[in-house]
Amino acid sequence: YLILQSLDAANDRMAEFKRSLCEFLPKVEGLKGDAARCGYELVGTEPLKLTVAPKSYGYTGDGLAAILRESGIFAEFHDPDMLVLMLSPLCGDGTLEKLRAALLAVERKAPITETSPPVPSPKWALTPREAIFAPSEIIPVDRSLGRVSAAAAISCPPAVPIAVCGEVIDECVVRNFKYYGIEKCAVIK
C-alpha cells in the first residue's frame, strides 16, 4: 500500500501545485522587478528562472554566487558571465524574501568590462569517432596547446563544448578553458 499512498500524495501535490504556481509567479515577477530597478541586468524570459548578467553590476557570476552563498542561497549555475537561480513555489515565500534581501544588499560596483574570449574556430585532426577511441590522457590545459582533444570539454553540462573530440587545441581554446575554469582536459596520447 506504500506505493498507492505515494501516488495519492503525488496526486494531491499536483492538484495543489497549479494554484500555488499561479500565486507564486507574480511574486517572482516582483522580485525580478526589484532586482532590475536596483540595477541588475536580467536576461531570459523563463518565469521560474532568475538569470543575472552581473558584470554590469560590478561582479562576475562566480563572485555574486559566492556572496549569495554567504546568505544561504545557492545558485543553480554560475560562471564568469552569468548567475542562474531556479525558483519554485516549493521554495516558499521566505526563500524569495531572503533572496530579495540578499540581492538588494549587494553593493553596486563599477562595471566589469572583461568579456569572454572569442569562440574558437575548430581545426580538425581526427574525426570525433577516431578521437574517442584513441588512447588518451588527462593533462593541465597549460600543456594542451597543439594537442588533439579526446573528449568534449565543457564548463557545465549541458553546454556547448569549447573543444570537441578530434579538434586541435589552439590558443583560443586554451583561453576559453581558463576563462571558464577548466583546469584539465583529455587529449590524444
Question: What positions do the PLM features span?
Answer:
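Conserved PLP-binding catalytic core of the aspartate aminotransferase-like
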Residues: L21-S71, P80-E107, P118-D142
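Short, flexible, solvent-exposed loop/turn segments with mixed acidic/basic and small polar residues
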Residues: E41-L42, I73-H78, V148-P158
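Short, glycine-/Ser/Thr-/acidic-enriched flexible segments
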Residues: A9-A10, K55-Y57, L90-G92, E167-D170, ...
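Conserved short beta-strand edge segments in small beta-sheet-based binding/regulatory domains
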Residues: R108-P117, A186-K189
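Structural signature of PLP-dependent enzymes
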Residues: L2-G30
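Short, hydrophobic alpha-helical segments
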Residues: N11, A15, L103, E107-A110
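C-terminal accessory/binding modules appended to enzymatic or scaffolding proteins
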Residues: W124-K189
